[in-house]
Amino acid sequence: MKRAKLFVFAFMMIIVTISCGNKDTKNIISIKKASSEKLISAFEKFENNFMLQSDLFDHGSAKAEFFLTDYDLEGPEAQAILQSTTIADTIIKNKIGITGLWVNDKKAQAFKYSYAFNNILTNEPKTDLINIVIGQKNIEAASLSIFTKTFSIPAQDLGKALALIDSKEFPANLNIDLTYNTLKALSSIRPNKASQKRYDKAQDILYKNAVITRNGDTYSIVFNNDDVIKFIPALIDAVKNDNRLTFLWKFYEKLLEKEFKEIEEKFNTEIKDKIKDCTFTETLSITNSLVAQDQYTVTVSGKEIVTFDCGIKNYENPIDELTYSFTITDPETPDANIVSCMFTSEGSVTDTVADVNCSLAIFFTDNPNTPLLPVFDMHGAFYADTAKQDDNFQIGMDMSITPSRNSKTNGAIEVSMQALGSVVKAPDMITYNIDTISMAMDEAEKGKHTLKLGTEASVIFSKKILEDIVMPKETVNVLETKVTEWQTIKEEVMANLKALSTMLNL
């Protein structure tokens, strides 16, 4: 989830912070910076008020627990299943659950992760599945139930460890800087000063010779094609060296070295020439000195083939009527969209109440000559009111997928999930309790199936470390371990797994 969020906001920053050298441009950049700041601040307000994100990524922890207490099933085969004893009945009877813990230990400079089963073994209330610690020097992993030592590799040598597992998929030179500071940078929405300067440099290139005209509160911009060609590698350099993204870029650049070179070659031999045949424009509408609508288009022979549009209606509550759309059109076929994406949101966020709905729809061309990808439509909702005492939390998602004509599945598939419970906010902690989870799937050929779960589940966000994750002091250096030593470790692990299987509480 963090990578997706980071990409969205990095993209937004590129779109809404553009600069060039004349008076109109200075006005545009000032307006866009103010608009960008208001939009990002609103998102940060939501995250900080309801998930303590800024505090957690400075120092804190999060904990999730799940216990099943009841279940009910509806559908064509529901009665036959309910009349027999299932593994769910055993899980409920023996109070088997799962616990996840995430810790950001600022003092130790380490992210710590722990996953454990509750009551899965006889007479053992908690069984560690895996514990992981990512520090500035080493990455450590341990599973105390099956091995009493900690596996350790240098934090910058994760690629070498992956190459030991599968040398065909992971090259030996895949040195990944997966340190505490790297992961911490990934959590930031805003780039550091050096990264921002690179984006500014790329934007200066793009707008150096742009033609800007103004009609009231609307700006029309036509970009110079040679500047567009120079802008693309400058933007790639900015993304590549972005303090938040450089880790991911270097990882994929080495993992997909051949593909990266092919893209670069194609840009230099084909794409540059095609860019010269295009017209690149922007239309910017301003309301109350803030961006109300911003549209970018790429046109070939008078036909728009790429369109990106974003709109923000109310900056006091930006989440309400926020829209983003992206369309790629077939230049040779009238009114035929190769792909069309639309994101919309509505609702409101205050210090105590968040009531947010968002939708994402993706459509592909229905062309008999090309494979048709599914139509995807998703809706999500989040509601929390920390001023109320009960029934003040709800989160849900529903999704509809229309398969392609070549798919073996006939008709749309509809999936939905909803969780109900309560939220309690203290000065240094937020606790979400989940009482029921409802899931449904409706398929044309199989009918509708509904599953309702009674749960004792919770998610806690805390400014403090709720509990620490302790690793075994004795370590195994993964990169220095010999084949014969691995065989001994394997035998010990298998023996412990066999012993544990006799203690299963299932």
For each feature predicted by the language model, list its residue ranges.
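Bacterial N-terminal signal peptides that target proteins for export
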Residues: 1-8
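C-terminal motif of bacterial Sec signal peptides marking the signal peptidase cleavage site
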Residues: 16-19
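Subset-of-secretome marker
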Residues: 21-506
